[in-house]
């Protein structure tokens, strides 16, 4: 590729980005309209949804320029990518499905192949987003080649063969796409579980509905449930919003035959999913465009979204388990002394008085319940900080007898002192060869944060917990990965979509990070010297760190001293 087309392309890219930013700052979408006003694909569109006006093919442009300009035009989604289709032959224009996949790149180049008129569009890929909005992040340097075939039509180069999908610059993606959670249920229909997707900001209501009907992302399959039966589909190509009501027209047979409870759960699931859409006030279920009545007889409780944790923390003070709350410590109610066991890393159940902790060498996991002495559950060469879920199972991870990583779960509640305790050992294939540094169950008990290491490289991942009908853990799904340039070894949940992670050090400055399922970049918190433990309550303002100088709470862009004495504070969970 010569220098001149490249310079033209860079100038066009800069102009495109400026245009997008200007449009973002000034474009206003009406929030209200006359009674009976109906919107279609624009339904639920944010006020600042941008519009990009791409450039049509230039006469006499060479093959490389046509390829580059075509992909730049892929940011222009108006009229079903009408301008981008001008770069294609008639047959290719009809066959091309731009919404099947979006590749987001950091940089690109056009590379000639050994085949005449066939080129590769080589990308340094930052993200890949599929037709259902499921995004996959890639580290810098990840390459992908898109094969492109060109031919001449009336003396002008046009693209005759190209894979479905578009490829857009990272800066453009951040402007025209947004992160939107769609919601599923835990198996007991008690909690709403977010499944964050990435959609074009102008197509959110229809896209969210289609994605919801397609089911959860791979890392949540088997861990969550949907009120919508498999195979249920939209029967219209749009989801119009009329006077604030999103009209969702579904397969008539399945909808009419569903129980009143299931229909209410369908409506609730959609309402949760649309909660961030400014044009949507309520949801109507329809069959053949006729309104289907949804009755609420009080038998179905609304699910809890973004489950809160109690304000108290459990900690260790002078070798004993204590409660830490409002910057004060008090004895842990009804729990016998465990000072002889050297407790560290304590955890408290969010739903009972069960407690777990490790011994000082972090090799033995203990549980203790009111009225009973502490009970050793397992001994390994090393174990992770215990973590409880809503189902009252306590989790840890460590090497098994053959050295391979195992994830362990125990249920100490309502077990007599001499009785066998329910126990599960899992060895998911995706953890083979890895050492787990942290395993923390999410507040609704459906997912887990897993930090693992192999050959000095760390991964921060979220997995789904698959359970039997009685709630017993059965498997951990292949996870989704949250990218960070650092090598954290500790992490905690901050909300239902965000975790805080850090690499502990008693001697160096430590910079915790917030990693979110709904963000493309980590958010670094203020550094603090010697942080060795981290805990989090409800939201980023309730993050606590511990160093040799005491406990500190995040305050704005800094840390506020709290109390010196207690160590290893941890919120229930």
UniProtKB/Swiss-Prot annotation:
Q: How does it sit in the membrane?
A: Lipid-anchor
Localization of this protein: Cell membrane
InterPro entries according to UniProt: GerMN, Lipoprotein_LpqB, Lipoprotein_LpqB_C
GO terms for cellular component = plasma membrane
Q: Name one Pfam family in it.
A: Gmad1
Alphabetic keyword roster: Cell membrane, Lipoprotein, Membrane, Palmitate, Signal
Presence of the UniProt keyword Zinc in the record: no
From which residue to which does the signal peptide run? Answer: 1-25
Instruction: Kindly list the residues that the UniProt entry marks as N-palmitoyl cysteine lipid attachment points.
Output: 26
Cystine connections: none
Q: Where is the lipid attached (S-diacylglycerol cysteine)?
A: 26
Q: Family membership, please give it.
A: Belongs to the LpqB lipoprotein family.
- Which NCBIfam families is this protein grouped with? PRK13614.1 (NF010139)
Q: What is this protein called?
A: Lipoprotein LpqB
Q: Which organism is it from?
A: Arthrobacter sp. (strain FB24)
């Amino acid at each position: 590729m010569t220098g001149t087309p490249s310079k033209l392309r860079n100038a066009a890219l800069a102009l495109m980005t400026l245009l997008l930013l200007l449009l973002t700052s000034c474009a206003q979408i009406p929030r209200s309209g006359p009674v009976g006003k109906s919107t279609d694909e624009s339904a639920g569109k944010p006020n600042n949804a941008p519009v990009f006006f791409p450039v049509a093919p230039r006469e006499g442009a060479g093959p490389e320029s046509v390829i580059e300009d075509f992909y730049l035009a892929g940011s222009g989604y108006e009229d079903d990518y009408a301008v981008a289709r001008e770069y294609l032959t008639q047959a290719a224009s009809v066959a091309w499905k731009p919404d099947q996949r979006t590749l987001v790149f950091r940089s690109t180049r056009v590379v000639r192949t050994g085949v005449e008129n066939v080129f590769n569009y080589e990308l340094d890929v930052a993200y890949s987003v599929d037709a259902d909005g499921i995004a996959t992040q890639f580290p810098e340097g990840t390459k992908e080649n898109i094969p492109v075939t060109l031919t001449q039509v009336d003396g002008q180069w046009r693209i005759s063969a190209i894979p479905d999908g578009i490829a857009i610059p990272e800066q453009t993606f951040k402007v025209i796409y947004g992160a939107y959670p769609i919601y599923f249920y835990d198996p007991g229909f008690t909690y709403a579980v977010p499944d964050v997707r990435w959609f074009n900001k102008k197509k959110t209501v229809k896209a969210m509905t289609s994605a919801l009907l397609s089911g959860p992302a791979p890392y949540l399959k088997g861990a969550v449930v949907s009120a919508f039966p498999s195979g249920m589909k939209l029967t219209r190509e749009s989801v119009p919003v009329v006077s604030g009501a999103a009209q969702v027209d579904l397969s008539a047979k399945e909808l009419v035959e569903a129980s009143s409870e299931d229909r209410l759960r369908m409506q609730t699931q959609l309402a949760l999913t649309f909660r961030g859409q400014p044009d949507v006030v309520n949801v109507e279920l329809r069959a053949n465009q006729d309104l289907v009545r949804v009755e609420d007889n009080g038998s179905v409780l609304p699910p809890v979204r973004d489950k809160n944790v109690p304000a108290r923390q459990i900690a260790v003070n002078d070798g004993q388990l204590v409660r830490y709350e409002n910057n004060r410590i008090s004895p842990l109610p009804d729990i016998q002394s465990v000072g002889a066991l050297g407790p560290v890393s304590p955890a408290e159940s969010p739903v009972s008085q069960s407690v777990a902790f490790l011994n000082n060498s972090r090799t033995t996991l203990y549980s203790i319940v009111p009225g009973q002495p502490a009970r050793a559950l397992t001994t390994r060469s090393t174990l992770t900080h215990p973590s409880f879920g809503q189902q009252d199972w306590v989790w840890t991870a460590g090497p098994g007898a053959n050295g391979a990583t195992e994830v362990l779960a125990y249920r100490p509640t309502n077990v007599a002192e001499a009785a066998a305790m329910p126990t599960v050992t899992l060895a998911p294939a995706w953890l083979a060869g890895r050492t787990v540094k942290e395993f923390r169950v999410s507040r609704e008990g459906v997912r887990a944060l897993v930090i693992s290491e192999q050959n000095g490289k760390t991964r921060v991942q979220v997995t789904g917990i698959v359970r039997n009908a009685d709630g017993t853990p059965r498997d951990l799904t292949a996870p989704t990965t949250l990218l960070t340039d650092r090598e954290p070894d500790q992490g905690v949940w901050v909300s239902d979509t965000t975790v805080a992670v850090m690499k502990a050090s008693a001697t160096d400055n430590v910079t915790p990070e917030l990693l979110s399922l709904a963000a493309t970049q980590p958010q670094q918190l203020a550094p603090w010297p010697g942080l060795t433990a981290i805990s989090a309550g409800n939201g980023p303002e309730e993050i606590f760190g511990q160093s040799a100088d005491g406990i500190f709470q995040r305050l704005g862009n800094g840390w506020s001293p709290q109390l010196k004495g207690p160590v290893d504070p941890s919120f229930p969970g």
